[in-house]
Structure formats: C-alpha cells, structure tokens
Amino acid sequence: MNATGAGYPLASLYVGDLHPDVTEAMLYEKFSPAGPIMSIRVCRDIATRRSLGYAYINFQQPADAERALDTMNFEVIKGRPIRIMWSQRDPGLRKSGVGNVFIKNLDESIDNKALYDTFSAFGNILSCKVVCDEHGSRGYGFVHFETQEAANRAIQTMNGMLLNDRKVFVGHFKSRRERELEYGAKVMEFTNVYIKNFGEDMDDKRLREIFSAFGNTLSVKVMMDDTGRSRGFGFVNYGNHEEAQKAVSEMNGKEVNGRMIYVGRAQKRIERQGELKRKFEQIKQERINRYQGVNLYVKNLDDGIDDDRLRKEFSPYGTITSAKVMTEGGHSKGFGFVCFSSPEEATKAVTEMNGRIVSTKPLYVALAQRKEERKAILTNQYMQRLATMRAMPGPLLGSFQQPANYFLPAMPQPPNRTFYSPNPVAPVRQAPQWTSHQSRPPQYQPPAPLMRAVPPRRMSSNISTMKQASTQVPRVAPHSQRVANIGTQTAGARAQVNPSIMRTMPHYKYSCAVRNVQPIGTNTHLQQVMEPAVLMQGQEPLTASSLASAPPQEQKQMLGERLYPLIHEMHPTLAGKITGMLLEIDNSELLHMLESPESLHSKVEEAVAVLQAHQAKENSQKSAQQSLI
C-alpha cells in the first residue's frame, strides 16, 4: 500500500492495544529502526493523564511508515501485541462502512494476528480487530479492507466456512442504527411468546393445552431447575405472528393455577437489559427533575447531630420534606441532606445557614449535586488551569527543559513557592514542610515576583490586599537585582511610563493563575503587578492560586498561620479554639475573611458566642452532678 495516496497524505501511523505503562520513549526505541521519526504522541486522559491505550507516530518518509506497518504489526510490547494501521484523519472514511466486514462466532483462540493472516489473502487491510473484554475474546471482530471489492471477495469466500472447527458468519458491517431498524421490523412479526409466573405445578403438556387454543404451536417448553421442578416460566412458539399476537392479547393478566400470569413477546437478554436500562434512566431523570433546586447538601456536621436536630435547624426556612444525616455503623459520617418543598425555601436556607456555627462547627450548605455534575465541574476547573499554564510563553518558564517527543507540553510545577533573594532582606519565617530544595528540577530558576518601584506607604493593619494592575513594562536585569515581595505595603497609583521606552520593550503575556517571571531593570520605576494577595508581616503573600497549588493538607495550615495572629489580637485566651473552629469553613470564605476585617470580626464573635454557650452548658451540668452527689 502506498501511504502517499489521496487517502493518506501523511506518513502517520496509529498504534493501538498499548499497555497503560507504554511511554513515548519506549515507542521511539521500538520504531526508530524503521526510519527517522518526527514525533510520537501517546494519547492520555485529559484529567488523570493516564494512557488511553493508543498512540500516533509521524515518520518523515511514507516508505518508513509503510515498512514499520509491514514488519512490526502485532509485535509485543510489555506483554501485549500492538496493532498498527494508517492514521485516517478523515472520520468519513472510518464511518462510511465501505470495505468494512463483520465476523462473528469466532473461536476464543483467534486473535488480531490470526484474523489478519486469514483475511489478508483477499486484499489490503486497513485495520483488523477482534473485540475483547477482561475475560478475552467476545467472539466477533471487524476487518476493514481498502476496497469494497476485496470485502465482497472475503464475504463470498469465508461466510459459512470453518475457522478452528467453528462455522463463522461473515457479512457487511452495519451500523447500530441500521441493525436497530432491521430488528424493529422483525420484532413486529414475532412468533415466540414468553410466559411467566405460573408456579411450580406446570409442565410442557399442560402449557400446550392452555395455549394451543390460539393456534398451531410449533414448540412448547417449561424451564426446569436441576431437580426437575418448574422455574415458573416458559416459551410457546406459534406458526405465524397473528396466532402469537392473539395469545398475548387473550392470556396476558389471566389467572392460571391461582396466579396472575404474564404473557408477552419473547425478548433476547440484551434487549431486556436495554429496556430496563431505559426505564431506570427515565425514573432517575424524573427524580432528578423533581428534586432540582430543592435538595441541599450539608457537611461538617457535629457527631451529635441526628436527623431530628438537622430538621430542627433548617425548619425556620420552609417546609422540609426530608432530612437525613448519613451514618455508617450507627455513627455520623459528618454530612447529610435536607430537602425543601420549593427552590425559594432552599435558596433562603443556603444563604442563612452556610457558614453558620452549629454545635461548635461551621456548616457548609449548598445545593446537592450528582456525582457526574461534580466530576464535570472539577474537570472544567482543571482544564481552565491547564489552559492558563499552557498560555505562558517560554521565557517565563526559566531554563526548565520540556521533555522531547510530546505534543502536549509538560507543565512545570515548582514545589517551592518562596524565593529568597541573595540581597539582605527582612527575615522571613519559613513554613515547615513546604519547601524542598532537593526536589527542584536541574537548572530550574525560581521565578521572582513582578515589581514596580513605588514610594512605600505605612499601613495601620498587618493585613492588606494587593490590587492587580493591567500593564507591565518588562526589562532584563541581573539575577542579583531580583528581590522578594515581603512586607505589608500595597501598590500605589499606576506609574507613568515613557512611551519611547514602551516602544522598545518586548511584550509578554501574563497569566493570573500562576506566578509569572518578570525581569526588571535598575533605573526604571516599576509598580508591582500581582493578583489580589493577603500580606502578613514575616510571611509570603497568600493568593487564591498559591493556596490552590498547595497540597490539601497544607492549605489549612497556611490559612491558620495567618488567621491565628489576627484572632489573638481580639481574644488572646481563645485564639487557638476559635482558629480551629474557623478552619472548618471553606477556603474561599477564609480568604475573604483575611481580606475583610469586618467579616473576620463577625465570624470570630459568632464563634465566641458558641464557645460561651457551650461552656455555660458544661458548667450547669457539672453543678447538677455535684448537687446529686
């Protein structure tokens, strides 16, 4: 076959049936003897980055690709035979069905290579596959020929032939829609009737006597178990459709042996499963529509809260149809669900109860979501971060080298979030377990924050918010002139920049989701450009992106180290308890509290009230116990 023909303008191969651990390097080592390779890409799941089991290899010359196809097809890599075919970029060629042959009733011992060797005598094969599951061959497969004439020859010769002592069916491939239309027409002319629920006191003779009144019965069978007792169902096959239809109409729902029997058209197992699945999906969708916008998810529940207490807490906001705390082994799992009678009541409950402290714990309340919805939202968030990372230009990534032979660029994620300048700066307390200089990639230079020199200004509080600017003036400067952003100052007014300087400066694109590298000059007045960040004396700036990039177990630690000194100023003796209570709140809400002293003060006072009420309750219980003694 000529790979340079009209259908295959590129020397590109599809390699399938790959082991999940196969990498680009392994494929390069395997295929490079065939000729120079331009690129190799193992396709991976966009969220988990796991291999999807296939890859594309682009050769420089079509002859090299053809040589690899002829000599390496079905070779074994990591214990699995690979399957190679030409990469067809036009989906119309793959889906047209021209030259595609379907084979069924295959012996379990026949694999892709055996099927390929058997049918290659009839013409050039584009692809060949035996369908398998976790248990092995499913007994059918497909062979896609280059021409329809070759497919016709294969069908005429092989249909009804024996392969490994089994008679196989070979025919033209039909799409599922075509098969369903054909099967639907046959279903309307059924002659086989299914009867169930007639009990154990039934045999073939008795069943024939009952159903022979509607026409000529070709066969009657009551299904038996191993002991010879009736399993309660059977089949009756009539000579024509009219007789079968009459039996169904007359006997369905009638009483036999004191039982109401079911009589209907006999169905294949896959058809019954399909109908049950459609029925289940319909019921599921109706339930989803019924509870859309009225079912609330409540988490961070105290262990002492049960169904009645949960209903009591939410009852002021509307009529509750159900309230359930999820348990395991009689112990609360810390979350539950509350269903209201209307979306308006549910919305009001979310507004009032989200973040409210109940039994020393702040609740998280939101509309309940199905697992598929949550997964889709998380995947969308991941894709947005991934797109932002890929939008960064090369100079911003320092000298970190990207692995070769990848279509999708690797995302450098430096483990260190703090860069300490060699210049003397104010001492900074390093957070434990957050940095590991040994884990940096070779030649990787940590990025410095973007700075614009502005007159410093004193702040009356230990906390401030950095406002993001919209312009940058990049200048190249030595490494020693980069400084870390440490302190409690905030950016002032936007600095004026000489237009002549702007014309000579290179322009870069910046991302708000990651920390960008910006070389700066020594003589240019620059204003710092960052996303909104919480600044604390002696600590690195905390932004939403830097918090999200940290491991989940460290996020609360980062927030707690910034919350504690602020709470300690308000209530020194209760700072530890209050900080622990507030850390149960969602991270985004905690960031807002750090940026808004009013919001923080409100939550702290609410927590103090809960602690005081709890202490008063304990004191009264102790007094009661002492009086009894």
UniProtKB/Swiss-Prot annotation:
Q: Does the keyword Glycoprotein apply?
A: no
Sorted alphabetically, the Gene Ontology BP terms of this entry are:
chordate embryonic development; mRNA processing; mRNA stabilization; negative regulation of nuclear-transcribed mRNA poly(A) tail shortening; translation
SUPFAM superfamilies noted in UniProt? PABC (PABP) domain, RNA-binding domain, RBD
Which cellular component appears as one GO term in the record? cytoplasm
- Fetch the Gene3D superfamilies from UniProt: 3.30.70.330, c-terminal domain of poly(a) binding protein
**A Pfam cross-reference name:** MLLE
Residue ranges annotated as coiled coil are: none
Q: Where is the RRM domain?
A: 11-89, 99-175, 191-268, 294-370
Q: Where is the PABC domain?
A: 539-616
Q: What does this protein do?
A: Binds and protects the poly(A) tail of mRNA with or without an AU-rich element (ARE) and prevents mRNA deadenylation. Stimulates the translation of mRNAs to which it is bound during early development.
Binding partners and assembly: Interacts with dazl in an RNA-independent manner. The C-terminus can self-associate and also interact with the C-terminus of pabpc1, independently of RNA. RRM 1 and RRM 2 interact with both eif4g1 and paip1, and the C-terminus also interacts with paip1. Prior to oocyte maturation, found in a complex with dazl and pum2 proteins and spdy1 mRNA; pum2 dissociates from the complex during maturation. Interacts with the translation termination factor sup35/erf3.
Instruction: Supply the name of the protein.
Output: Embryonic polyadenylate-binding protein
Q: What organism is listed for this UniProt entry?
A: Xenopus tropicalis
Encoding gene (name): epabp
